[in-house]
From Swiss-Prot:
This is HssA/B-like protein 45. It holds the Pfam family Coiled. GO terms for biological process: sorocarp development. Residues 1-31 are annotated as: Disordered. Belongs to the hssA/B family. InterPro entries: HssA/B-like_chaperone, HssA/B-related. It comes from Dictyostelium discoideum. It comes from the Eukaryota.
Amino acid sequence: MTLFSSISSISNPMTSSKSSIASFGSGTSMSSNSIACGGGCGGGSGGILGLGLGLGLNLFGGSGSRGACGGNGRSGNPAQGGNGGSCCGGPCCGI
């Protein structure tokens, strides 16, 4: 399930410390925010945080870097029914 290890070359100065770019490459939980969430939990303020790619649920994190779970305080991501950031605590991804 090796995904986007090459994406680690993307260095976004706005990424949150929670969002570990290096954690990409597997679908397992490598930080407090499971990569299964698409990486969106840690980078609510990240600009082009492509880490939302995680499982391909949200290929374009957009300016809000929603990731697969609505990102950090963002809302309305169809992939998770708009849980709006609850993923950061685990519930939306079932962590």
